[in-house]
Amino acid sequence: MRENELEQRQMEAAKIIVALKKQESELQEIINSQYQNREQLESLHHLDTLDIQQIEAHKAYGLKLIVDAQNKERIIANTKVLLERKQKEVREAHKKVEILKKLKEKQEQEYYKEFLDAEIKEIDDITSARFNLE
């Protein structure tokens, strides 16, 4: 039962990691778009004729990309916090599983010790009874 809980927590953490990687990839795409937009804007300034509408469109798109990048960075930060919490839950679940394993091993050792003690006592009783008969 505890092992199922551990597996569930690990699966949840894995899903968060996948989501985080996707978000980081999307942020990188936004950064690349910003770079390309900046290059296109600079190339517009070097043309013989200035197209104000295109320049304004690139500036507006650049501002949108900045906002998108900031939002994505916030989402990534929140996802990292969520991942840290989930990793803590995984560690706690793993700790519980290990404790139960150790407890089970200890109980098995105690059982076998009691079994062997009972067997030794029976052998001693049989041996004692034999000597008493002779």
Predicted segments — roles?
Residues 1-134:
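Charge-rich amphipathic alpha-helical interaction elements
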